[in-house]
Amino acid sequence: MTPHFDYSEVPYSFGLCAAENCPKASTCLRRIAMQYAPVNRIFLPTMNPNRIIAGKGKCDYYCSNEKTRFALGFTRTANALTVRMASTFRYRMISYFGRKNYYLKRRGALKITPAEQIYVINVAKELGVVLNDYFDGYIEEYNWNA
């Protein structure tokens, strides 16, 4: 079992897996979460066992238990932009994230995924911003959306 696994971090609708004999069970976040499910949760969102059997060892729903490095906030990048480029950067970020998520991600209220980090860095570089670090902070967590 994974040490220091906190089931309270598991999203409510995150699909769990009951396949004990799966070759990837020891590193699958879905299986690990199932092992740590609290007794007071009577019904759990669980993958259909027949689907697992039909897959013959291949699982399309495998979710690695490796933690992912998420970025928090990119005000550092936004502040490094010239006045002329700031609006272009903002418009491109809003078209990518959406207006609400742009402001939440900019200030660090929403995590920025690795793919989103690459996009932010590429746009900043296109606009002439070169920094050692483009984000305000980082956090390592399980990627429940993988």
Language-model-derived ranges and their functions:
Residues M85-S95, Y102:
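Short alpha-helical "recognition helix" segments of helix-turn-helix
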Residues G98-I112:
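Recognition helix of helix-turn-helix/homeodomain-like DNA-binding domains
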